[in-house]
């Protein structure tokens, strides 16, 4: 079915979100060979490819990495994540999470965040992104304009950020700058 989409609509990219690393590589090689234009391959890999693929050793969750005080170590971890993604044929990681975990009632961010302060989230996420870039992987910080101080699961509904423009600019948007 995917091969038909590639041929019929000349799609430019794919996102993978489940399976195993061997099958993933086989599919990607097949799809790339079939496409006349190289496909941009993406994955939602906030804590490495183990977030989506089975039988892969996971990296620590962002909440754990939020406690690491060594930016060079975080950058090295980000690079290892990126190298793992690159080996599988991934070019683009929908990560890191730039949400500031400031709402205990938030049902979805929690351990996906690097912390509860804008400074910590900015610092930790930047090092992880730089590591990915060192490995040649594109990144996309999420969830713009901030999902850390909401009480809804964005996989089930559309959360809203009901703060003043000043607050959103000072807090929620800070890691995106």
Regions found by a protein language model. Name each.
Residues 2-124, 143, 148-164:
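Enzymes and membrane/adaptor proteins characterized by extended Gly/Ser/Thr/Asp/Glu-rich
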């Amino acid at each position: 079915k995917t091969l038909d989409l590639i041929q019929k609509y000349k799609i430019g990219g794919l996102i993978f979100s489940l399976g195993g690393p061997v099958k993933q590589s086989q599919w990607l090689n097949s799809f790339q060979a079939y496409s006349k234009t190289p496909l941009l391959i993406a994955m939602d890999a906030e804590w490495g490819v183990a977030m989506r693929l089975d039988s892969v050793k996971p990296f620590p969750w962002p909440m754990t990495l939020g406690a690491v005080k060594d930016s060079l170590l975080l950058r090295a971890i980000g690079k290892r994540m990126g190298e793992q993604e690159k080996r599988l044929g991934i070019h683009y990681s929908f990560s890191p999470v730039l949400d500031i975990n400031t709402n205990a009632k938030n049902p979805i961010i929690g351990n996906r965040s690097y912390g509860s302060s804008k400074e910590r989230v900015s610092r930790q996420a930047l090092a992880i992104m730089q590591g990915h870039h060192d490995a040649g992987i594109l990144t996309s910080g999420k969830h713009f304009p901030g999902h850390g101080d909401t009480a809804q699961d964005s996989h089930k509904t559309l959360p809203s950020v009901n703060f003043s423009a000043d607050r959103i600019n000072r807090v929620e948007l800070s890691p995106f700058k």
